């Protein structure tokens, strides 16, 4: 009777242990016969030459037997690796050797990703792969326009070493599958995996194909190594389906597509692309689909139905992967038969429409594993840990800039963080692009987690489009997602773009956040506000009318919206300018920062505004920092200014240098709501070095302004010296 690989391994290991113990006992007894133990510090009596020779011979024999048993144990493990995969009853990964993949072999992974939600899901999948991987990766992403914009920017700012990204336009592949009726919730994108032999480069010979709802619990190189086990006509590596779907017994009159036994799940696929092309894969799946659709009328599980119909007709095409490479958490799963302990898990597949809410007796364990990567700091994955050459395109210029900085500089933190690369996830939640309108305006602002409560309030005051940059950690981003999905107010809005900038460093990158929100607005005009301000009711329509009254051929204008503030957390918000003036007179409202930074808004000329009925022009003055409406193509904010101090002042100065007219709107206002001091303003007030660094950055900004605008910028230097 032949032993299984596991039995052989256990027997040899036990034999090796017993032999070692016997050798030790023999030597101990031999020494004890001469009245001496083998203690390392005790003096030894001289043994007779014949006994010593016999002892050495037996010791050499024991060592040789030990070596031989170790060699046999290794051979059993190698034999196990070459024969253990792909058997239906193999539910444990203990006997599987680690990857045979070469250390720096490039692993190719293909993923179909479309829309805002799928773009979020794929990030968690990629994190789990990157966390475990030890090889360079090349991701092939088949995307729609939304996912291309979101993921293209995310990976460009993520800058992970030894990671290449290629994008493929899903629109060019849709005609190949659009004729197939599909009832699956993934829609037409759930069929695109059928087209990968056409979509991917012709010189790419093999690829791992993954759904976006996959989580890896091991090194993907182990899965890649299984390609070497393919033999004969095998071109597809798949795990058996772990529900009774294809057996047709889930409910009365259930008629599934044809499948081999339980069928196979296509959440994880190994594709031998070169062989698939040789056997005419495109024609094969198309003819099979046409034949089956005559009876089935539509697919229920998208591409999976067609893959299974092909395998039913040609079973030699499939290599059955061990089930732990796709532990399926569907509504009718039997996946618990696939693992006995955590070490058995390789890949978790959340293939139920209910996702994390699926019913499974071990779902808490799986959910914890998933949440680990969902909230994992993606910046940590930038570190080069695999010892393979990185692709040049993933190395940002910021690294070269950082290496040139002087770490002894008292302002080193400011300079380092001003050039740091932050991961940016655009359009974190679904939203619609506003229809073209020459007078439309987007409210632009930035915030951190502690200002999240302002979102619903602003939504009640501003009905127009918004572009908001949120500075969050990976974990906070998920808290924001849950908050937004639970808010009826936010869910009712489809014209708000939320753009997550992930935390990096200690200083708040306020101007980077403003630039992200500014560049990702989609209207001709923007209202550059801050999150702590509530717009007056009707401000959106008033600004549109004010923009329409401008002379399009005239000089560029910055329309100033006067700012006020209240110290009361509960405020009866003014419904008109008359109400606001009354509240000013009673002390319920004040002009913004009149008591701590009066010159920041004094040039607005509040006395004139009280009685103004038409827009009026004002002149620039030092430290002026109003909130303005400008064209979207205005100058960006200077990102050297971080935290507190001069971040808006520098922007208004540049608008003036570009000869923008500063015009105050007579019937517009915003009100600043009270909040606790930010961390950065506290540091500005308490740290002399912080203030000195802000001053140094101001001087450098003045010099740069002079270089760009020449003599026109002299007045700013003069004003600075006369302060």
Curated annotation (Swiss-Prot):
This is Xylosyl- and glucuronyltransferase LARGE2s. InterPro entries: Glyco_trans_8, Nucleotide-diphossugar_trans, Xyl/GlcA_transferase. It is an enzyme of class 2 (transferase). Disulfide bonds: none annotated. Its main location: Golgi. One of its GO terms (molecular function) is metal ion binding. Binds 2 Mn(2+) ions per subunit. The xylosyltransferase part binds one Mn(2+) and the beta-1,3-glucuronyltransferase part binds one Mn(2+). GO terms for cellular component: Golgi apparatus; Golgi membrane. Its cofactor is Mn(2+). Pfam families: Glyco_transf_49, Glyco_transf_8. The chain crosses the membrane at residues 11-31. PANTHER family: GLYCOSYLTRANSFERASE-RELATED, XYLOSYL- AND GLUCURONYLTRANSFERASE LARGE2. Residues 1-10 are cytoplasmic.
């Amino acid at each position: 009777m032949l032993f299984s690989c596991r039995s052989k391994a256990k027997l040899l290991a036990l034999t090796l242990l017993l032999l070692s113990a016997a050798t030790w006992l023999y030597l101990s007894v031999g020494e004890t016969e001469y009245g001496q133990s083998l203690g390392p510090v005790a003096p030894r009596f001289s043994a007779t030459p014949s006994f010593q020779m016999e002892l050495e011979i037996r010791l050499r024999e024991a060592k040789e037997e030990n070596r031989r048993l170790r060699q046999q144990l290794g051979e059993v493990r190698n034999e196990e690796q070459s024969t253990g995969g792909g058997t239906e009853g193999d539910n444990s990964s203990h006997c599987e050797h680690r990857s045979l993949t070469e250390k720096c072999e490039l692993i190719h992974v293909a993923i179909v990703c479309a829309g805002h939600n799928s773009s979020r899901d794929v990030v968690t999948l990629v994190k789990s792969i990157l966390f475990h991987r030890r090889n360079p990766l090349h991701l092939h992403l088949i995307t729609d326009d939304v996912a291309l914009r979101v993921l293209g920017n995310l990976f460009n700012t993520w800058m992970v070493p030894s990671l290449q990204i290629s994008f493929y336009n899903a629109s060019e592949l849709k005609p190949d599958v659009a004729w197939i009726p599909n009832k699956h919730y993934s829609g037409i994108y759930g069929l695109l995996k059928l087209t990968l032999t056409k979509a991917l480069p012709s010189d790419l010979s093999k690829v791992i194909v993954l759904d976006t709802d996959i989580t890896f619990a091991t090194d993907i190189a182990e899965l890649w190594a299984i390609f070497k086990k393919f033999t004969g006509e095998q071109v597809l590596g798949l795990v058996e389906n772990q529900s009774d779907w294809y057996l047709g017994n889930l409910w009365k009159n259930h008629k599934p597509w044809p499948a081999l036994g339980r069928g196979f799940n296509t959440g994880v696929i190994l594709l031998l692309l070169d062989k698939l092309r040789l056997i005419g894969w495109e024609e094969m799946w198309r003819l099979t689909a046409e034949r089956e659709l005559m009876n089935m009328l539509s697919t229920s599980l998208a591409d999976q139905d067609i893959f299974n119909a092909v395998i039913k007709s040609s079973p030699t095409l499939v290599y059955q992967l061990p089930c732990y490479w796709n532990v399926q958490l569907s509504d009718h799963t039997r996946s618990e038969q696939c693992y006995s302990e955590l070490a058995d898990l390789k890949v978790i597949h959340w293939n139920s429409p209910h996702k994390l809410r699926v019913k499974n007796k071990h779902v808490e364990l799986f959910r914890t594993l998933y949440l680990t990567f969902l909230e994992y700091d993606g910046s940590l994955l930038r570190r080069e840990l695999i010892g393979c050459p990185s692709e040049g395109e993933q190395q940002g210029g910021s690294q070269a800039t950082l290496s040139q900085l002087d770490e002894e500089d008292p302002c080193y933190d400011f300079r380092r963080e001003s050039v740091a690369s932050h991961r940016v996830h655009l359009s974190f939640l679904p939203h619609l692009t506003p229809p073209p309108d020459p007078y439309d305006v987007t409210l632009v602002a930035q915030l951190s987690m502690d200002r999240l409560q302002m979102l619903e309030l602003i939504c009640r005051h501003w009905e127009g489009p918004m572009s908001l940059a949120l500075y969050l950690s990976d974990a906070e981003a998920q808290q924001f997602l849950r908050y937004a999905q639970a808010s009826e107010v936010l869910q009712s809005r489809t014209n708000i773009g939320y753009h997550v900038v992930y935390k990096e460093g200690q200083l708040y990158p306020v101007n980077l956040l403003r630039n992200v929100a500014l560049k990702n607005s989609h209207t001709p005009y923007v209202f550059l506000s801050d999150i702590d301000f509530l717009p007056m009711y009707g401000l959106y329509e008033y600004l549109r009318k004010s923009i329409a009254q401008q002379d399009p051929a005239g000089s560029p204008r910055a329309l100033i919206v006067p700012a006020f503030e209240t110290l009361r957390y509960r405020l009866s918000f003014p419904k008109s300018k008359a109400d606001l003036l009354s509240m000013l007179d009673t002390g319920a409202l004040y002009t913004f920062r009149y008591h701590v930074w009066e010159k920041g808004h004094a040039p607005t000329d509040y006395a004139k505004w009280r009685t103004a009925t038409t827009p009026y022009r004002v002149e620039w003055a030092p430290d002026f920092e109003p909130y303005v409406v400008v064209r979207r193509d205005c100058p960006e904010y200077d990102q050297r200014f971080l935290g507190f101090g001069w971040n808006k002042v520098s922007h208004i100065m540049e608008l003036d240098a570009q000869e923008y007219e500063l015009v105050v709107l007579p019937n517009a206002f915003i009100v600043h709501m009270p909040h606790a001091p930010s961390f950065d303003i506290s540091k500005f007030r308490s740290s002399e070095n912080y203030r000195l660094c802000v001053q140094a950055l101001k001087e450098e900004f003045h010099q740069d302004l002079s270089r760009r605008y020449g003599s026109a910028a002299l007045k700013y230097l003069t004003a600075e010296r006369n302060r």
